C-alpha cells in the first residue's frame, strides 16, 4: 500500500498551516510535507533576501511546529518530509537551513529537502551539504537534494542546473557518499524540455537512493506545478518506473498551483481532487 502526501504551503498561505493540516487529513492524505518557504523571503526580481514575520521565523518556532504535529496526530495525519527555504545561493537563507532541519525533527519528518545551488559543481555543493549533515544526523533527519533547472530566455526553455540529469544527480550523491544524503526527484522538473531527461529514466538511474518525491504535472516546457493528469506528463510510465525501482517512500504531491483555481470556501474540494490524483498514481503502481 503506497502512502500519499502533499505540500501544505499553497493552502497555508490562504488558511494557515493549522487549518491546512486539518483539512488535508480530512481529504484523505496519509501525510504532509512541512513546507517552510515562509520562514524567510526572497525577492527574485532584485535578488534580495527579506525577513519574514511568519511563526517559522520567530523565537517560538518550535512551539508552532509542535502544535502542528499535535493537530496532525489528532486528525490522523503526520509529517513525512519537509522543504527548506531557498535559494541557497543567498547566504541569509542558508543561515535558516539548520532551523528548517530542527523544525523537521520537531514535526516528526524523516527527510528535509534542501536544494543544491543551481550553478555549483557536485564538489562545491558537497561542501555545502557537509556543513549541514552532522546537524541533520544529530536530529535524526536525512537531507534530500533535488533536481533543479535554470531558464534560457533565448531558447525559450529550461536549461541545465545542479542534479538536472541522472549523471549530475549521482555525481552530487557520490561526492558526499553519505547514506544520510538522499535524492528527492521532482517529477515535473525531470520532464521539462531543455534540462530534464525524463522522470522514468531518472527514477531507474537513482534506484534505492531515491527516497522522496515532488509530484506535479506540466506541459513539459514550464514548471507548472499542476495537479497530476491535467497536463502532459505520462504518469503511467512514472508509476511503472517507481514500481520497477522498488520505490518505498511516500507519493508526495507538490502541485502548489492547483488551489489557485479555488475560492477560499472551495479549497477543501481542491484538496480532495489532489488526494484523488495521488491515489490514482498509487493504483497505477499497484497495477504495474
Locate predicted features:
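Histidine-acidic metal/acid-base catalytic patches
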Residues: 1-40, 73, 98-102, 108, ...
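Short, well-structured secondary-structure segments
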Residues: 30-37, 78-83, 112-113
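Glycine-rich, proline-tolerant flexible connector loops at the mouths of alpha/beta enzymes
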Residues: 33-67
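Positions that flank functional sites
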Residues: 39-40, 86-88, 118-120, 151, ...
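Short aromatic-enriched loop/helix-cap "lid" or pocket-rim segments at secondary-structure transitions
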Residues: 44-46, 155-158, 226-227, 264-265
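The substrate-binding groove and active-site-proximal loops of carbohydrate-active enzymes
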Residues: 52-58, 83-90, 115-119, 227
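Catalytic-core regions built around general acid/base machinery
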Residues: 58-74, 131-138, 201-205, 237-241
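Active-site acidic/histidine proton-transfer and metal-coordination neighborhood
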Residues: 66, 70-78, 87-185, 191-192, ...
Amino acid at each position: 500500500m503506497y502512502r500519499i502526501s502533499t505540500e501544505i504551503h499553497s493552502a497555508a498561505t490562504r488558511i494557515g498551516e493549522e487549518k491546512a493540516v486539518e483539512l488535508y487529513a480530512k481529504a484523505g492524505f496519509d501525510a504532509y510535507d512541512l513546507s517552510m518557504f515562509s520562514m524567510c523571503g526572497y525577492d527574485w526580481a532584485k535578488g534580495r533576501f527579506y525577513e519574514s514575520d511568519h511563526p517559522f521565523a520567530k523565537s517560538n518556532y518550535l512551539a508552532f511546529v509542535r502544535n502542528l504535529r499535535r493537530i496532525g496526530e489528532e486528525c490522523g495525519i503526520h509529517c513525512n518530509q519537509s522543504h527548506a527555504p531557498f535559494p541557497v545561493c543567498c547566504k541569509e537563507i542558508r543561515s535558516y537551513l539548520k532551523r528548517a532541519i530542527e523544525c523537521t525533527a520537531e514535526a516528526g519528518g524523516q527527510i528535509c529537502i534542501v536544494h543544491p545551488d543551481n550553478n555549483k559543481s557536485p564538489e562545491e555543493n558537497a561542501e555545502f551539504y557537509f556543513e549541514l549533515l552532522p546537524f541533520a544526523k544529530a536530529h535524526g533527519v536525512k537531507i534530500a537534494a533535488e533536481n533543479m533547472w535554470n531558464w534560457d530566455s533565448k531558447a525559450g526553455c529550461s536549461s541545465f542546473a545542479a542534479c538536472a540529469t541522472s549523471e549530475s544527480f549521482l555525481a552530487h550523491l557520490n561526492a558526499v557518499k553519505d547514506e544520510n544524503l538522499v535524492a528527492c526527484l521532482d517529477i515535473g522538473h525531470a520532464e521539462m524540455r531543455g534540462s530534464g531527461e525524463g522522470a522514468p529514466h531518472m527514477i531507474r538511474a537513482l534506484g534505492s537512493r531515491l527516497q522522496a518525491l515532488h509530484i506535479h504535472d506540466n506541459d513539459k516546457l514550464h514548471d507548472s506545478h499542476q495537479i497530476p493528469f491535467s497536463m502532459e506528463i505520462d504518469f503511467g510510465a512514472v508509476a511503472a518506473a517507481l514500481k520497477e525501482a522498488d520505490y518505498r517512500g511516500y507519493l508526495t504531491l507538490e502541485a502548489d498551483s492547483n488551489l489557485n483555481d479555488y475560492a477560499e470556501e472551495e479549497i477543501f474540494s481542491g484538496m480532495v481532487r489532489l488526494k484523488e490524483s495521488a491515489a490514482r498514481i498509487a493504483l497505477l503502481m499497484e497495477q504495474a
